[in-house]
Amino acid sequence: MSDFDVTICIVTQGQYTAMLNEFRTINPNLRDRVDDPPVDDDNIKYIALVGKFKWGPWPPLFGPNPVENFRLGAAWVNTSTGYIGGVFKTNLPANVQVAPFLLDATKALGGTWLECFDGKLRETYAKQGFVTVARSPFNREYAPETWNYDVEGEPDYLVMALPGSPTHKY
């Protein structure tokens, strides 16, 4: 991200959904990996990570609204329960990390816990301070439709929380 100036924006449900639909179109093999936000819940806050190249002005062709610039990733948080969901990055190289920015923003809005499969996401979330508080064996009955068993195996399902949060105590 060193070539970019980035910022976190609060966005509307419609803007978040548009980004999510774009992600699902570009990444059909991951289309069922990102949670849809609950419908009609006033406790949901949507965020987007957007950026621009440092050496140029905010490009006018993307419009005055920052969400119209380079969309790098998004997430949502339920401010009443602390649940963080729908974290994704756009079609960026694997080495471009957006999760730290998104998780810092969701934590600032009251996010304290999330779910994932054991593996790279667990490692990413652990670097942001989340610890595993519950672990369940992989269950094919609940596996995403697009799950690739040959590549992804059958990792445990995890609930991770920030230490000291209500979810961490269980």
Regions found by a protein language model. Give the residues of each.
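Generic non-transmembrane alpha-helix signal with a bias for helix starts/N-cap capping motifs
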Residues: 99, 117-119
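Glycine-rich acyl-CoA binding loop
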Residues: 91-106
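Non-catalytic substrate-recognition and accessory regions of acyl/acetyltransferase enzymes
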Residues: 1-92, 108-113, 120-131, 135-170
